């Protein structure tokens, strides 16, 4: 037994060093091979590092279901806050990329329970959870997350959330509240011009619903003159102006 144990220990150590060398040389196949060998012995001192290395490659290769499985294992084994957070983040991103709403909501909720979460990771968790809630028609829960995000329109997630809050109000036929939300966004401003432009277009839709077609047209013309990015905004403006003739 002693000889076998020594043999397996040597095999584990060799696999670990080969995994590290593979990582340094950016040899993904070597990392996958040797991390896989290490993980055949689940309770080695190296299993967390092996899971981190393998999950990262699987995620980058878009094998999100396999990455999610590894990140879940890492979460269960993690011995430090940093590794637990890394696992939770990996779980969230993998689930979100798979568009698995149930897994995304679970991973985000798990992540938001972490004590030392950076504002960036908190925003990411709120954003992905809000989008998953919207997909699941859990509009009230989505609105809570979106409103929390929308407090800071300087971030990309915050800017999109501000627009989505107004969109939810518009869909609920709460036109006065939607108008107020968008005018507040315009006043606050944001470095993320696309979401501000989308909000101008939404405001024109709100005004059409309120039978203020002149105001709707004015906002569209103002946006047409001032927004010149190469995206889908121009088409949205033209479609609406055509209907307002």
Q: What residue spans do the PLM features occupy?
A:
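TPR/TPR-like (Sel1-like) alpha-helical repeat modules
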Residues: 211-231
């Amino acid at each position: 037994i002693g000889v076998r144990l020594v043999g397996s220990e040597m095999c584990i150590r060799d696999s670990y060093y080969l995994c590290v060398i593979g990582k340094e040389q950016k040899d993904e196949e070597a990392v996958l091979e040797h991390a896989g060998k290490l993980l055949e012995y689940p309770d080695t001192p190296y299993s967390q590092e092996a899971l981190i290395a393998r999950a990262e490659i699987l995620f980058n290769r878009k094998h999100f279901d396999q990455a999610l499985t590894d990140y879940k294992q890492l979460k269960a084994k993690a011995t430090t806050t940093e590794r637990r957070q890394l696992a939770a983040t990996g779980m969230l991103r993998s689930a979100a990329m798979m568009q698995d709403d149930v897994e995304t909501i679970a991973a985000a909720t798990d992540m938001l329970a972490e004590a030392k979460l950076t504002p960036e990771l908190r925003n990411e968790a709120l954003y992905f959870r809000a989008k998953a809630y919207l997909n699941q028609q859990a509009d009230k829960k989505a609105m809570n997350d979106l409103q929390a995000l929308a407090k800071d329109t300087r971030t990309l997630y915050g800017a999109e959330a501000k627009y989505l809050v107004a969109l939810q109000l518009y869909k609920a036929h709460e036109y006065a509240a939607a108008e107020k939300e968008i005018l507040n966004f315009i006043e606050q401003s944001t470095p993320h011009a696309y979401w501000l432009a989308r909000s101008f277009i939404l405001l024109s839709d709100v005004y059409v619903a309120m039978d203020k077609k002149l105001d709707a047209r004015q906002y569209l013309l103002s946006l047409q003159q001032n927004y010149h990015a190469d995206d889908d905004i121009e088409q949205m403006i033209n479609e609406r102006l055509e209907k307002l003739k």
